């Protein structure tokens, strides 16, 4: 087997799917293939185990259980594993090949590669990772189940931020797919408001695994209720036809524009803006976002000023990210909900009226590889709104003008109402 085939196999082993892709590559370089004939002992009860075994082909049986009902639980097949783990514990068991059997063995001296502090990086402690990477960090609880939390310095807007749902759910789905397959499309629905004070449980359902494509459904659960669902499709890189009709609009270079923090300071002292608005901005608690944003057309408009339903801005993650393409797509998914549906409110803003936008669904198509820690241009347009529902579309371009992501979202647009207790329907 070549290294790519080994990496692809390891990416389907449940034990290893919590690891960052860099760890899988290291494991692929040190595993040793071992072959056994039918009836051969893989290990004996009194034998010292060589390391952690991953079954590549064939089946094996753990000897001992005689009950017919339990026997299937001790039949080991492709992607199953046994042996020495992180604890170094030595197990006592006879394991016999039930057919021609091939195992990849991770030697004992390399079992430390099974340890990681982050699902995204193996060489960097979590506290040194970027904020957005820490927001997207999940704790694997058991096979296909992950736990996410809302960090104190994460965007919340009084409830769990929609982009956090999309990013964390996509992260959970990505950790159950071999890393040679990356997400190319996702469709999601926001069902209930998320509580920022309790963890979110992400339950991944493996809908399909093919040679080139895989499909996952993720349910986000709080207090026993499904509050968000995501369906994502993953594809292995393939060569094929290419064209691009969409053209990136002509906008200022991001290096010439003010950051969100600089723009805020400028607006506080701008006499062209209403005093009441400036005082409100100045006294409001400001928590910097994990995403750097630079508006292409800074203006003197406020949230009480009517404006066209369109917006262009550059964005990138604060801090350097690892090279894991899955992480970059999760970060872009997280960032994509920032200010997105609010553009649909622009034509309806007026003095004395507080308006609100609540995301109902969110869809994304990833066309090309991207880096979320490099500038991306987000072009947002809201073509229509009717019966309290606004529709927005988005395109993301890299600095070379390549279209990397397309997006759509429908949102509830209406005058603001008093907040309801968390766990109630968004509708």
From Swiss-Prot:
Record note on pH: Optimum pH is 8.5-9.0.
| Gene designation | ACH2
Which reactions is this enzyme annotated as catalysing?
A: a fatty acyl-CoA + H2O = a fatty acid + CoA + H(+); dodecanoyl-CoA + H2O = dodecanoate + CoA + H(+); tetradecanoyl-CoA + H2O = tetradecanoate + CoA + H(+); octadecanoyl-CoA + H2O = octadecanoate + CoA + H(+)
Documented EC number(s):
3.1.2.20, 3.1.2.2
Tell me what this protein is called: Acyl-CoA hydrolase 2
Source organism per entry reads Arabidopsis thaliana (Mouse-ear cress)
Q: Supply one GO CC term from the record.
A: peroxisome
Q: What Gene3D superfamilies does the record point to?
A: Acyl-CoA thioesterase, double hotdog domain (2.40.160.210), Jelly Rolls (2.60.120.10)
UniProt pathway annotation:
Lipid metabolism; fatty acid metabolism
What tissues express this gene product? Mostly expressed in leaves and flowers, and, to a lower extent, in seedlings and siliques.
Inhibition and activation profile: Insensitive to feedback inhibition by free coenzyme A (CoASH).
């Amino acid at each position: 087997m070549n290294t790519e085939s080994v990496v692809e196999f390891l990416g389907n082993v449940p034990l290893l799917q919590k690891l960052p892709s860099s760890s899988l590559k290291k494991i692929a370089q040190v595993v040793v293939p071992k072959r056994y004939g039918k009836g051969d002992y893989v290990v004996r009860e009194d034998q010292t185990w060589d390391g952690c075994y991953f079954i590549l082909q064939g089946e094996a049986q753990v000897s001992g259980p005689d009950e017919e009902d339990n026997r299937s639980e001790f039949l080991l097949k492709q992607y199953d594993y046994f042996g020495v783990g992180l604890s170094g514990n030595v197990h006592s068991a006879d394991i016999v090949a039930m057919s021609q059997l091939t195992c990849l063995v991770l030697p004992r001296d390399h079992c430390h590669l099974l340890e990681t502090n982050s699902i995204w990086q193996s060489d960097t402690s979590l506290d040194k990772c970027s904020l957005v990477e820490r927001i997207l960090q999940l704790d694997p609880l058991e096979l296909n189940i992950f736990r996410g939390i809302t960090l104190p310095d994460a965007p919340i807007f009084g409830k769990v931020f929609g982009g956090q749902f999309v990013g964390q759910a996509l992260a959970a789905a990505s950790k159950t797919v071999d890393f040679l397959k990356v997400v190319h499309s996702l469709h999601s629905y926001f069902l209930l408001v998320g509580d920022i004070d309790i963890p979110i449980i992400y339950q991944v359902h493996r809908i399909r695994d093919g040679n080139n494509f895989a499909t996952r459904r993720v349910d986000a659960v709080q207090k026993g209720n499904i509050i968000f669902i995501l369906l994502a499709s993953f594809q292995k890189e393939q060569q094929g036809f290419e064209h691009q009709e969409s053209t990136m609009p002509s906008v200022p270079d991001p290096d010439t524009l003010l950051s969100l923090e600089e723009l805020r300071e400028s607006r506080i002292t701008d006499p062209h803006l209403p005093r009441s608005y400036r005082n409100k901005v100045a006294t409001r608690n400001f928590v910097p976002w994990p995403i750097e944003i630079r508006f292409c057309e800074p203006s003197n408009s406020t949230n009480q000023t009517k404006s066209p339903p369109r917006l262009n801005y550059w964005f990138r993650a604060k801090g350097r990210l690892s090279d894991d393409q899955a992480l970059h797509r999760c970060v872009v998914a997280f960032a994509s909900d920032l200010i997105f549906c609010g553009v649909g409110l622009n034509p309806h803003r007026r003095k004395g009226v507080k308006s609100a936008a609540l995301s109902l669904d969110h869809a994304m198509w990833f066309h090309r590889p991207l880096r979320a820690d490099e500038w991306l241009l987000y072009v947002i347009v809201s073509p229509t709104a009717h019966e309290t529902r606004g529709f927005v579309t988005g395109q993301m371009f890299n600095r070379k003008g390549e279209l990397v992501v397309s997006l759509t979202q429908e949102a509830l647009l209406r005058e603001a109402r008093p907040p309801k207790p968390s766990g109630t329907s968004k509708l």
